[in-house]
């Protein structure tokens, strides 16, 4: 088996691609039980990584401030709203 990249080191895109591969393998149903359990655990970690990255991106977008013309002028702390 190849060495797996730690989930916490993955970009959103890489984690999403691997999550799709894991789901495909599990849906095919041709994986041994022990391997299925490992895949499921890996998939759960990948899902959490993707959710965390999406939340972080949403927070950045929510913090963008606009001027009177609707142009971005910077960011503000999330709790300043």
From Swiss-Prot:
Top EC class of this enzyme: hydrolase
InterPro entries: Exonuc_VII_S, Exonuc_VII_ssu_sf
Keyword annotations: Cytoplasm, Exonuclease, Hydrolase, Nuclease
Compartments, record wording: Cytoplasm
Cited function: Bidirectionally degrades single-stranded DNA into large acid-insoluble oligonucleotides, which are then degraded further into small acid-soluble oligonucleotides.
NCBIfam families the record matches: PRK00977.1-3, xseB
Name of this chain's protein: Exodeoxyribonuclease 7 small subunit
């Amino acid at each position: 088996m190849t060495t797996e990249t730690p989930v916490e080191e993955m970009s959103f895109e890489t984690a999403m691609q691997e999550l799709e591969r894991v789901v495909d393998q599990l849906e095919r149903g041709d994986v041994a039980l022990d391997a299925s359990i490992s895949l499921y655990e890996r998939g759960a970690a990948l899902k959490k990584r993707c959710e965390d990255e999406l939340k972080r991106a949403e927070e950045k977008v929510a913090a963008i401030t606009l001027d009177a013309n609707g142009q971005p002028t910077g960011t503000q702390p999330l709790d300043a709203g």
